[in-house]
């Protein structure tokens, strides 16, 4: 049997005024990924699946994000915001191309899963013409109720229109829907706007399908999974749910989180085996951590690659472009950016390494700074394998420190250092006998008496 194809339409044209943000609502992040990106990543994306995203006329950034996440996404503009059904029909061209299953979702529900999208399609394969995603609300106030009889969906009843018995229903409408592609346009075109707001509501599709003598049904998911994000408070709630998911998944994969509730992960964080994450670690997007690595407390990592049995922190900041080789060590109060640090190299404390390549087993002393920026451009520092950089050294890029070379403590290095050489740049130390006493005596003579 040939697999059914699908078209998923993601509605992302909302203004999001309650977010009180200049950023379009669906671009706000949860676990380092935009709300929209979470939904697009969960939507079907096989060879026989298509994707359309409906955006507002003034939200080009939303379209750009959709294309970044899913290059196959077709972007459609809802010129006027006249309701959910009107938004779906903004993608009329995509619907008209045909699909076995039409899925409709919202760009502000980041917790929806690929598994739920798959389950939403199953009743269409078994004779239903329309499927609505529902959830059991802890407090159903304000939600549309799903009225079910004999296992079939008979109506979506908004709270203002619900009877006393219907108000007791806790099964609520999540807004996500699947429609048989053969009837989708016919059903959508029959939706009218004879209501107080003059808008076209997708929920009216249930009655239209039943009037056609066809079957509508419901599948259920958790309330968490269909949380819509309209305020910063709801954004924080979604972050909490997502972080719990990510932590549980990490621990199930063999990661040791010593205090899970204090560790923050990104949606794309990847781990090897036997990784240990100590309390109060923040991992941003683009981080991979290989087998046996340890991330000590109060470290912050973004777009960094951590090798096997490497160590980071405590109190380390790894910025984008950092790569640690196997067994490398980044210690306390070290910041790195665009830095390749090869196997076994050590940067133990109080150091900035930017735009640099540190060779295998090199040792970088406390207080070393790679001076990579001249006010206009960044420049690279190269430190050879086995090199030793003494404490409190400044390496003024562009500069190369040779294999096995030494740099004496306190040096300001502006020229390349050959392999195996020692480079020292200091003024001659002098000592002036008796100077301290003369200084104190002079200060005492000029000091004003203290007031009593």
Curated annotation (Swiss-Prot):
GO molecular function: glucosamine-1-phosphate N-acetyltransferase activity; magnesium ion binding; UDP-N-acetylglucosamine diphosphorylase activity
Residues that, per the record, bind acetyl-CoA: 366, 372-373, 391, 409, 426
Recorded catalytic activity of this chain's protein: alpha-D-glucosamine 1-phosphate + acetyl-CoA = N-acetyl-alpha-D-glucosamine 1-phosphate + CoA + H(+); N-acetyl-alpha-D-glucosamine 1-phosphate + UTP + H(+) = UDP-N-acetyl-alpha-D-glucosamine + diphosphate
Annotated positions binding Mg(2+): 108, 230
Region ranges (Linker): 233-253
Signal sequence bounds: none
Subcellular location: Cytoplasm
Chain's role: Catalyzes the last two sequential reactions in the de novo biosynthetic pathway for UDP-N-acetylglucosamine (UDP-GlcNAc). The C-terminal domain catalyzes the transfer of acetyl group from acetyl coenzyme A to glucosamine-1-phosphate (GlcN-1-P) to produce N-acetylglucosamine-1-phosphate (GlcNAc-1-P), which is converted into UDP-GlcNAc by the transfer of uridine 5-monophosphate (from uridine 5-triphosphate), a reaction catalyzed by the N-terminal domain.
Subunit field text: Homotrimer.
Name by which UniProt lists this protein: Bifunctional protein GlmU
Natural source organism: Rhodopseudomonas palustris (strain ATCC BAA-98 / CGA009)
């Amino acid at each position: 049997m040939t697999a059914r194809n699908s078209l998923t339409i993601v509605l992302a044209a909302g203004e999001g005024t309650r977010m009180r943000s200049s950023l379009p609502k669906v671009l706000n992040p949860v676990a380092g990924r935009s709300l929209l990106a979470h939904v697009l990543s969960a939507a079907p994306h096989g060879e026989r699946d298509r994707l359309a995203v409906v955006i507002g006329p003034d939200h080009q950034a939303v379209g750009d994000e959709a294309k970044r996440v899913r290059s196959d996404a077709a972007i459609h503009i809802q010129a006027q915001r006249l309701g959910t059904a009107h938004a779906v029909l903004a993608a009329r061209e995509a619907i008209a191309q045909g699909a076995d299953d039409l899925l409709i979702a919202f760009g502000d529900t980041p917790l929806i899963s690929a598994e739920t999208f798959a389950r939403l399609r199953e009743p269409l394969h078994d004779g239903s013409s329309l499927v609505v995603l529902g959830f059991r609300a802890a407090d159903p106030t304000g939600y549309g109720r799903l009225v079910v009889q004999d296992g079939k969906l008979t109506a979506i009843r908004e709270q203002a229109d619900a009877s006393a018995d219907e108000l007791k229903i806790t099964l609520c409408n999540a807004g996500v829907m699947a429609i048989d592609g053969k009837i989708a346009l016919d059903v959508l075109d029959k939706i009218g706007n004879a209501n107080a707001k003059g808008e076209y509501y997708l929920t009216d599709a249930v009655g239209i399908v039943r009037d056609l003598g066809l079957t509508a049904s419901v599948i259920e998911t958790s309330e968490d999974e269909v949380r819509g994000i309209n305020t910063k408070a709801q954004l924080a709630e979604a972050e909490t749910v997502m972080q719990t998911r990510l932590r549980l998944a990490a621990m199930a994969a063999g990661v040791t989180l010593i205090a899970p509730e204090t560790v923050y992960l990104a949606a794309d964080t990847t781990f090897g085996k036997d990784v240990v994450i100590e309390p109060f670690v923040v991992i941003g997007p683009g981080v991979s951590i290989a087998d046996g690595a340890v991330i000590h407390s109060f470290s912050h990592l973004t777009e960094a690659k951590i090798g096997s049995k490497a160590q980071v922190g405590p109190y380390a900041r790894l910025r984008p472009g950092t790569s640690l080789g196997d067994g490398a060590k980044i210690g306390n109060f070290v910041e790195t950016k665009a830095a390749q640090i090869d196997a076994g190299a050590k940067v133990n404390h109080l150091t900035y390494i930017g735009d640099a390549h540190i060779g295998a087993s090199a040792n970088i002393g406390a207080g070393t700074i790679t001076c990579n920026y001249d006010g206009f451009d960044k420049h690279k520092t190269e430190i050879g394998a086995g090199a030793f950089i003494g404490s409190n050294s400044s390496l003024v890029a562009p500069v190369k420190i040779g294999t096995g070379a030494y740099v004496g403590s306190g040096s300001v290095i502006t020229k390349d250092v050959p392999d195996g050489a020692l480079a020292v740049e200091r003024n001659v130390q002098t000592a002036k006998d008796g100077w301290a006493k003369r200084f104190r005596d002079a200060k005492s003579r000029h000091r004003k008496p203290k007031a009593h």
